[in-house]
Amino acid sequence: MTEKVKRVVLAYSGGLDTSVILKWLQEHYGCEVVTFTADLGQGEELEPARKKAEMMGIKPEHIFMDDLREEFVRDFVFPMMRANALYEGQYLLGTSIARPLIAKRQIEIARQVGADAVAHGATGKGNDQIRFELGYYALAPDIKVIAPWREWDLNSRSKLIAYAESRQIAVPKDKRGESPFSVDSNLLHTSSEGKILEDPWQEVPDYVYSRTVNPEDAPNTPEIITIDFERGDAIAINGEALSPAELLTKLNELGRKHGIGRLDLVENRYIGMKSRGMYETPGGTILIQAHRGIEQLTLDGGAMHLKDELMPRYAELIYNGFWYSPEREMLQAAIDHSQARVSGTVRLKLYKGSVNVIGRKSPNSLYSEKVVTFEDDAGAYNQQDAAGFIKLNALRLRLLGERNAKGL
């Protein structure tokens, strides 16, 4: 028997899945539905989502549409960039990092309207169900969570489309007149999954890409830019101070123009299976390269190496949905502490899909040209000191070698 629910807050995009879920919640639970649509910079008009919700019987006062772009970049993307976070060495976590913010705002709305449940449109095969629900429970331990994909019998795209058509819910088509790929988009990235991409041997067709030009078609002339950093966060491009969301938007424009940030990836989902996705992260790809460039100049070597050791664990926590966990917060505190003097300017070259650091400077630089020079260093470094350093580090290896020579 279905548990009684009076009012539910649905994370609503206005797309096919969440529109079907909205109708299903009304029919299956007989409850009042409140919709929440987050503007995370996905680049789509949000008003169609409002109109669609109204057409499906949602009261205007129960339709929430929030511009979260600045909060998204400032409080979620930038902290992650301070860590140089990459899941499995490649993925910039564009979908993963958006879910904690959506969950946070959903819970806030649920409290505001007196809802006793929240709902999402993530499937029972993916990571997003975990990310959303770990966020819900961390912020509202007693909230009821409705995950329709784990409850209903609409277990395929064809059944979902049939349900939609039977209830006059518009079924979107892509530019080829076909049902679209599974797409997630925000200010940091766009991901595409499903259909032909489910065969990992098939090359991603060019028509799938939406955020970047083909690198082969990018300008034949490189573009040189500078990014200014303060305490680990980017604050300006080419000397122009920008807000976090404005800065990432500008980097996205530059990355799009030069075909930067495409990634074809087979990844290990937390749920246990492998999946293949196509990611476009133009601005984020530029930003992480620039951040590493300024760290190379300003971060102590031991601190940098420790940070690099911690990064995979930090990235895994975000990927798996543990943004609100104490261990993520502990790692974040250490990472943020490391950024106290990570300030300065990085110069980069953008060209046909590549981004390369070609210069960096900082008032906090640990780089000493006087010490490292191949020319006369005027006594800044005594090369004879290296002999004792090497002997001490070789001691255990010499003892091991002596034992091996005895055949022991």
From Swiss-Prot:
Instruction: Keywords in alphabetical order, please.
Output: Amino-acid biosynthesis, Arginine biosynthesis, ATP-binding, Cytoplasm, Ligase, Nucleotide-binding
Entry binding sites for L-aspartate: 123, 127-128
Which cellular compartments is it found in?
Cytoplasm
UniProt keyword Cytoplasm present: yes
Q: Where does L-citrulline bind?
A: 91, 96, 127, 131, 182, 191, 267, 279
Q: Which InterPro entries match?
A: Arginosuc_syn_C (IPR048268), Arginosuc_syn_N (IPR048267), Arginosuc_synth (IPR001518), Arginosuc_synth_CS (IPR018223), Arginosuc_synth_type_1_subfam (IPR023434), AS_cat/multimer_dom_body (IPR024074), Rossmann-like_a/b/a_fold (IPR014729)
- Top enzyme class, one word, equals ligase
Task: Give the EC number(s) listed in the UniProt record.
Answer: 6.3.4.5
Example GO BP = L-arginine biosynthetic process
Q: Which reaction does it catalyse?
A: L-citrulline + L-aspartate + ATP = 2-(N(omega)-L-arginino)succinate + AMP + diphosphate + H(+)
Where primarily located?
A: cytoplasm
What NCBIfam families does the annotation carry? argG, PRK00509.1
Q: How does it assemble?
A: Homotetramer.
Q: Which family does it belong to?
A: Belongs to the argininosuccinate synthase family. Type 1 subfamily.
- Protein name as catalogued: Argininosuccinate synthase
Top-level taxonomy: Bacteria, Pseudomonadati, Pseudomonadota, Alphaproteobacteria, Sphingomonadales
